[in-house]
Amino acid sequence: MSYRAVLWDLDGTLTDSQEGILRCTQYALKACGIEESDPQKLIRFIGPPLAYSFATFYQMQEPMVSFAVEKYRERYGTVGWKENRLYPGITDCLKALKAAGYQIAMATAKPEFYAKKIVAFFELMPYFDVVIGSSMEHSDASKAYLMQRAMQQLHIPETQKEQVVMIGDRKFDAEGAAACGLPFIRVHYRYAPVGELESYPSVYLADTVLDLKTFLLAHAAS
C-alpha cells in the first residue's frame, strides 16, 4: 500500500511533552487538594483529553473536573507549553515527507490554539498543511472527529482514505484511526502503558523517528 497523506498526533509522537504536562498536572491536582509525586501516575495524562484524565484517573466529577482543567491551563498557557522538545529527527522527517509529496496534517486532542503555537515555536509550520486540535470549550472531542476534520481540510474524499495514514502512540490514536477506517502507524517511543496497543491493528511499528521516515518514504504514492 502507498500513502499520500499523513496525520500526526502531537504529544508523545511529534514532541516529548512530559515535563510540561507533568508539572501542569501536579499544579492542577494541588489546587484540587491532591499532592501527587508518582511520575507513573502523572504520565497517564500524556495523550488523552484532560477532562477524561482527571475524571478517570482521580475519580473527579463536575464542577471539579472543569476546575482542574482550568488550573492546568493556567500554568500551561504561561510556561507549560514551552516545557517541550522535538523528538530527534522530527524536522528532517517532516522535510523529507514534504519533499516526497506527502500532505501533512496534525490531529491532536490538545486545544488547537496551543497546537499551532507549539508547531510555530519549533518552526514546523512550513511542513504542515493543516493543524487540527480541540476547542477550548470542547476539549473532549473524539480523536476520530479530529481526524475527520483534518481529512476534510486536506480535501481527501472517502474513496481515497486508505491512502491516509495516522501516526500515534496511544490507544486513542488507534481507536480514532479504526473508527475512520484509516491505517495506523504506532510509534513506540516511551509513553503508552505496556500492552495498551497490542490489540489494535497497525501497518507498522516505529521504534525511532528514523524508522518512521524510512517506512513512509518507501511507501510514498508516486
Where in the sequence are the language-model features?
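Acidic, Mg2+-coordinating phosphoryl-transfer loop and its flanking beta/alpha structural elements
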Residues: M166-Y204
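Substrate-recognition element of Asp-dependent hydrolases with the DxDx(T/V) motif
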Residues: T25, C93-V119
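Metal-dependent phosphoesterase signature
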Residues: A55-D92, A100
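Helix-loop "lid/cap" segments that line or gate small-molecule binding pockets
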Residues: A28-L29, P49-E62, I118, A150-Q153
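Active-site neighborhood of HAD-like aspartate-dependent phosphohydrolases
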Residues: M1-R44, Y58
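Structural recognition of alpha->loop->beta junctions
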Residues: F122-I132, E196-L216
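Substrate-recognition "cap/lid" segment bordering the active-site pocket of phosphatases
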Residues: F113-V165, K171, A178-A179, V194
